[in-house]
Amino acid sequence: MQLPTQQVAVLDAASTDDPQRIEALAADTDYPPETIAGAALALEAEGLVAVTETTTTTVSLTDEGHAYATDGLPEVRLYRAALDAGADDAPVEMGSVIGAAGLDGPQVDIALSNYARKGYGTIDSGALAADPDADPENDPEADALATLTDGDSVDDDAVVDQLASRDLVTVSERTVRSVTLTEAGVTELMAGVEATDEVGELTPELLASGEWADVEFADYNVAADAADHTPGKTHVLRQAAERVTDVLVGMGFQEMAGPHVDADFYINDCLFMPQDHPARNHWDRFALSNPARIDELPDALVERVERAHREGAGDDGDGYHSPWDEDFARALALRGHTTSLTARHLAGLADADVEAPARYFSVEKAYRNDTLDATHLLEFFQIEGWVLADDLSVRDLMGTFREFYSQFGIHDLQFKPTYNPYTEPSFELFGRHPETGELIEIGNSGIFRPEMLDPLDVDGDVMAWGLALERLLMLMTGFEDIRDVHGTLCDVGFLRNAEVVY
Amino acid sequence: MPVVDIDPDELRRLTGHRSKDDDELRQDLFGLGIEYEGETEDGDFKLEFEADRLDRLSVEGIARSLRYHAGDDRGVDIPDTNAPEWAIDVTDVPADRPYVTGAVIRGVDLDADALDSLIQLQEKLHATMGRKRAKGAIGIHDLAMLKGDTVDGDGTAARSLTYTGIDPDGDTFVPLDDDAERTPADVLTEHPTGETYADLLADHDTYPAIYDDIGLFSFPPVINGRRTEVTTDSRELFVELTGTDQWTIDRMCAIICYALDARGATIEDVTVDYPDRELHRPDFAVRTKHVSHDRIETLLGVEFTTEAVVDLAERAGLDATPTDDGYDVEIPPYRVDVRHPVDVVDDLGRAYDFNDLTPRYPDVNTIGGRTESSRLERSVRQALVGLGFEDLLNFNMTSEAENFDRMRLTPDHDAVGAAQPATIAEPYSQDFTILRTWALPSLAMVLETNTHHAYPQDLAEVGFAAHADGDTQTGVAERRTVAAVLARNDASYEDAKARLQALCDEFAVALETPPTTHPSFIDGRAATIEIDGQPAGVIGELHPGVIVEHDVEVPVAGFEFELDALR
């Protein structure tokens, strides 16, 4: 039969009646021990050798143990000094005995704590008494130290344990594997065993010389764990944003971009939000102090927006019975929603004039001064989308959103009529969580009001919707705390291990 | 969104739906878009609904809506009113609160529940339409305690009250929940309710006050006098509202009158005598919106017969009269949310039930696509990931300390990242006071947060940065920035430059790195990133002071430059 070289060497070196240790075989064959161990295990698997394991215990002296083997154990030295001072007759003052014994430093405590334990005498109120019957010549611990110094082994486990607890010896266990040739091994050897040419690594030289064709490659343990590797990785929330973008582009939506800091005019007034609406003075908005006001607003647009707020739209429309002040509209803030981009696009301020039919979207940041918790951050990604066409109906809105959400595994969408200052009709969108089955709100939608569209000079109907990307990601992946993901408190380990969104 | 507590038994009694159990009631309420949020300790329903239907802020209003929804009532209902006996004479009112309205209510029978409901309605109207009493404030009084002098015999009103403005210390009265005579000014500093609403009158030279023959009895928008306090024994009420807008207070007044009418009371007109005109209130005038039949069909996506539209309107509590091309739809006075014919269409859709509509995908063809800048951003992010970087997503808001101080930088340095930041006016937290002017500080913060994780930590971000710049339209220059750090035992300038070079090669731009100095980097190990000959950013080994400041124990090399330089 053919076997790898190192296995042949092991077979040749092994015998049927004399178990050979791996280290001995390694020395005989000039291979490293780990190679021989691997070869022996491979041969054992073939039944050609038997591998036996025995565990041996080695006891070796520590530096402190060596010192006591030479100088005597501190408690024995104390006892001898005590006898010299006559403590076997009457207790003597401890300090002088310690001095006479030549003990200092930590040895003093060691001597005192072992003195009584081993029956050399008693210590009471600083006075030392010695037991005249104690036998320091036969102290088992001292004997064991001497034995170990001579290179012999100590059989009394209790004494070894005691010495180990005093840090005078270290006890180590070692597993020794020994190899014996089996009957089958003998048979194969008799039949003849040849060595194959086996290499550990494929090298450029092997490839260049063509030798690779004549060699065997050593087997690896392919089931073993490999070292950790940290790949470059797209942020999981960004992956979700890309996924949403893919879906929307596929549905014919064109991307919008625009300023994060914008005038309230575009964030609120163009959306027919009355200036005394609680949300506009509320602390949940991030107003800017520097810069605080936008300089330029399109005069004609401002005038039309103001008129819509005051008078409404159409022949018998009503406006808000609320104050409207252009200066208030000039206040700059971080956009609370990306619907400000929609306003700018519909007004023709972003691109060329937008004309029906058109679909637009953005997946971008909005800012809300909310309480931070597992589902709320001060910054979040808003998915904003809208469709401009002639004669859009509520049914078209429902069909569009049903299609969008079904791309994310959310079916049986439900529409709850709701109120929103700039849409009518308006709907909250509810869907079932794919895993928990719970009915949860997953977006807000509606058809823009004439009071919004007329001033922007839009010809046609516009239906729009928005939702937080984070909410969608939570639905898609089931992760629970947004703070692990987004922002400078993010956990790099969490991001490294986050499952890919596709 | 407003939350109102409603006694389900009251709701059963007022709707006449006496046999419905709590579950059925909850289901009916959901059909109106009113969400059940739980129960109070007394077993009342806590109901949450949208801020448009303020006529539903009371059990009476909700009962009315439920009766329409169930088909028990149809069309517009206007309560009969009796001719006025009382007048409100308006003289020398405060300039900032010039409007008043009111009504007299006779034959009320207020048990404790009904009184609670009335007080709750008043509070909820204050909180919503009344804009915390600034825009409209309601006072309700026991009419029996008022004494009006007899006016001339022209038959319009025999008794009159006066709404006027007085000196803050010009008179005294005993306010509700109090025993002492106080001036209005004293009320604002000495009475708990006065303290709450003192801000509303901060700019007033004279304070609003309502007088009868006996004297001052109401100090709107703050508090009523104790003399006219309403109790369960009150049988006749005087309702007055003051505010900054006549329409608003008239609508609030109508909502209150409708609630009391639902409990069997009789509404009596009040004359409001302004110096230049005379109004009869409450204003129960019906408004009309013209809605085209075509608009109803196109907006709802359903074909209707004329009869069907009229039926839906009546079930929404409206009245629709067919015209040539549509309908004249009458809107009852308690509806404050109907501004435009689309609001009528929404009502029709709700009466029809939107969830009975069949969704359809619109037959509208458009071409989708991304912006160029978004495509570039995605490509750079992918290239960075290919170079082994972990893509990060940090906050755009940060603090001066993080953005500047901890990076050894000031806004006045001549260095990448140094600029006047866009500043948040009233920061919620010290951690978020400005928009970041560059992104490297964010990456340093992430390194700081993650010192317990294995190195190397090679982090990158393609993100937003901004600074104040008067030459831009909004006064803020916003841009996309590319930032990266390499944190590891042997991180060096060369490691950072090798990756930057690879990135520039991928985008076919020429990179040069002439030496520079930057407070965040080690002198002699920092360079300007010049892309195609233009300065675009900075690269180098982070200054040990910056590294130690962030509790990081390994060297860090990094770079940051403007995304647009790769175009």
From Swiss-Prot, chain A:
Its main location: cytoplasm. Keywords: Aminoacyl-tRNA synthetase, ATP-binding, Cytoplasm, Ligase, Magnesium, Metal-binding, Nucleotide-binding, Protein biosynthesis. It is found in: Cytoplasm. It holds the Pfam family tRNA-synt_2d. SUPFAM superfamilies: Class II aaRS and biotin synthetases (SSF55681). GO terms for molecular function: ATP binding; magnesium ion binding; phenylalanine-tRNA ligase activity; tRNA binding. Binds 2 magnesium ions per tetramer. CDD domains: PheRS_alpha_core. The keyword Lipoprotein does not apply. Mg(2+) binds at residue 424. Its EC number is 6.1.1.20. The keyword Acetylation does not apply. Its cofactor is Mg(2+). Tetramer of two alpha and two beta subunits. NCBIfam families: pheS (TIGR00468), PRK04172.1 (NF003210). PANTHER family: PHENYLALANINE--TRNA LIGASE ALPHA SUBUNIT, PHENYLALANYL-TRNA SYNTHETASE. This is Phenylalanine--tRNA ligase alpha subunit.
Curated annotation (Swiss-Prot), chain B:
It is an enzyme of class 6 (ligase). Mg(2+) binds at residues 337, 343, 346-347. GO terms for biological process: phenylalanyl-tRNA aminoacylation. GO terms for molecular function: ATP binding; magnesium ion binding; phenylalanine-tRNA ligase activity; RNA binding. Its cofactor is Mg(2+). It is found in: Cytoplasm. Disulfide bonds: none annotated. Pfam families: B5, tRNA_synthFbeta. Keywords: Aminoacyl-tRNA synthetase, ATP-binding, Cytoplasm, Ligase, Magnesium, Metal-binding, Nucleotide-binding, Protein biosynthesis. Tetramer of two alpha and two beta subunits. This is Phenylalanine--tRNA ligase beta subunit. It comes from Halobacterium salinarum (strain ATCC 700922 / JCM 11081 / NRC-1).
